[in-house]
A protein has these predicted regions:
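N-terminal signal-anchor transmembrane alpha helix of single-pass membrane proteins
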Residues: 1-38
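Phenylalanine-focused residue identity feature
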Residues: 6, 21-23, 29, 40, ...
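Membrane-proximal, non-transmembrane interface segments of integral membrane proteins
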Residues: 31-103, 107
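Cytosol-/stroma-facing membrane-proximal "stalk/adaptor" domains immediately downstream
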Residues: 100-207
Length: 207
């Protein structure tokens, strides 16, 4: 490939990316208030996820299954984890938009102490949502690699350890999920228990 052709490819990629982000900005959701949060959240089975990421569950699985049966069971578990991580990442995006709107909102008729506490809660949610989305993106990439290369019976690689998905570098699922849930609760409390409960129920899996 000549230098001229390479330059054209780079320019095409840059223009495509610019158009993608431009259209994304035009089609983004308007200022997301707390009333716009519950209806857009997707239920997630966090309890089952935590069980799958538990090292004790991993040990039991390896002791009870071997070979093809183990790899097939791991593929099922990885697809389950991927589905719920996608939902969690979506939810974190919704919560991030909410926190952005709250940080821009002007607080009228309240003390300076209350206003600062309110903004601090919004900042905590903003930070927690960003961290969780980063963890989810890295974990989803890791799951894709495992599904392709580590769970195929014809590829001579050791089966993966699902508990390793509990952390990506310094990002730990249990800590990040707890931080995100706590931040949602803290900010939601400023709107009263009814609004707070509505958001948290939408965030949890249906019983």
């Amino acid at each position: 490939m000549s230098a001229y052709a390479f330059l054209l490819v780079v320019l095409a990629l840059v223009c495509t990316s610019a158009l993608y982000f431009f259209f994304g900005r035009l089609s983004r959701f308007p200022c997301r208030t707390i009333r716009d949060v519950p209806a857009f959240l997707q239920p997630v089975d966090s309890a089952s996820m935590m069980q799958l990421l538990n090292p004790e569950t991993e040990e039991y699985l390896h002791s009870a299954m071997t070979g093809l049966a183990l790899r097939l069971e791991q593929r099922r578990s990885l697809h389950f984890l991927r589905e719920h991580l996608i939902r969690m990442s979506h939810n974190a995006h919704i919560l991030l938009e909410w926190s952005n709107a709250e940080l821009k909102r002007e607080i009228v008729g309240q003390s300076e102490e209350y206003s600062e506490c309110y903004r601090d809660c919004a900042r905590q949610l903003h930070s927690a949502a960003i961290e969780f989305r980063l963890y989810a993106a890295l974990s989803l990439f890791k799951i894709k690699l495992w599904l392709v290369f580590r769970t195929q019976p014809w590829i001579p690689l050791e089966p993966p350890s699902l508990s390793d998905l509990g952390h990506v570098g310094s990002l730990r699922f249990f800590t990040l999920y707890s931080n995100l849930t706590r931040a949602v609760s803290n900010l939601g409390q400023h709107y009263g228990p009814e609004f707070c409960d509505e958001v948290l129920k939408a965030w949890a899996v249906a019983a």
